[in-house]
Regions:
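Composition-driven recognition of glycine/serine/threonine/acidic- and proline-rich low-complexity segments
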Residues: 2-281
Length: 281
């Protein structure tokens, strides 16, 4: 495998695949990692489009629509990217490929065989997979009826006995839940979990939040047994910070500025109308 080469004396953190692994790989770097996979002749890796950084000369690329993605056409109609990229080593010698997530992420290797052949993850978490892995987007975890904001939670399932790689923002914590153990997580920080875990989501907000501010967390209540992966910096949270930094000072300092102005004028209107009515009387 090609060794990482830098012009500085600081070598990146390297996670080496276990010696018993069928396909050798390395995870390079710290906060924005690169996955480097060694491919034997005719060996293939399936990756999300737009994740390739570099390859050896023997690697051939092809855009494919996974046949198991039954809802792909419907997602494409609403602007979703449903095309994956297949990378095949067409040479007679070993080759390599470097993949990375489109945001600041750490990369987690997931051996599906150790998870009972199935894991559920956020739709943007999947990076690539090797061997026997099927990626579907038919899972749609919603909150109980009447709870607002539950769409889009853990809508992707990875099934098979192969090796998958998922990306998570910031630092990653793994929690092993015992039978009946409960864990409450911000839904945006939930990356992936075992399919054996039962959970529901709640929207913990109040009518005062749009006016006075505060967190309105969409929380996931998880009940074991199973394994949970939690990220410290979801891309949604990072994008909100960036958006606030590039907006005008009034909106940046108080995102609910326009709501408060609207309420002020509404109350002023009520006071004026009331004074006119009292004057007529």
């Amino acid at each position: 495998m090609a060794a990482p080469s830098l012009s500085t004396p600081f070598q990146p953190y390297v996670y080496q695949s276990p010696q018993a692994a069928v396909t050798a790989f390395q995870i390079l770097g710290g906060e924005a990692q690169i996955l480097q996979i060694m491919l034997k002749p005719q060996e293939k890796v399936l990756a999300k489009s737009g994740t390739m950084c570099y390859t050896s000369g023997s690697i051939q690329m092809e855009n494919v629509l996974p046949p198991e993605n039954g809802g792909g056409l419907w997602q494409w109609f609403f602007g979703k990217n449903v095309i994956n990229t297949s990378f095949v080593n067409s040479g007679s010698q070993d080759g390599f490929i470097g993949l990375a997530a489109p945001s600041l992420s750490r990369i987690l290797p997931i051996d599906l065989a150790t998870f009972g052949g199935e894991i559920i993850c956020q739709p943007d978490a999947y990076l690539c997979s090797l061997n026997d892995v099927t990626v579907t987007t038919t899972v749609n975890r919603r909150p109980r009826p009447g709870i607002f904001g539950g769409e889009g939670i853990l809508r992707q399932k990875l099934v098979g006995r192969g090796l998958a790689f998922i990306a998570a923002g910031g630092s990653v914590v793994q929690k092993n839940l015992a039978q009946g153990e409960v864990l409450v997580v911000d839904a945006a920080c939930l990356v992936a979990m075992s399919s054996t875990i039962d959970f529901h989501v709640k929207y913990g907000s109040s009518a005062r939040r749009p006016v006075f501010g505060g967190d309105g967390l969409l929380t996931a209540h998880l009940t074991g047994p199973g394994i949970v992966f939690i990220q410290s910096l979801p891309f949604y949270r990072l994008s909100q910070r960036i958006a606030r930094a590039v907006t005008s000072p009034n909106v940046r300092d108080n995102p609910r500025f326009f709501v408060q102005i609207g309420i002020f004028f509404f109350l002023a209107y009520i006071m004026i109308v009331s004074s006119l009515l009292l004057t007529d009387v």
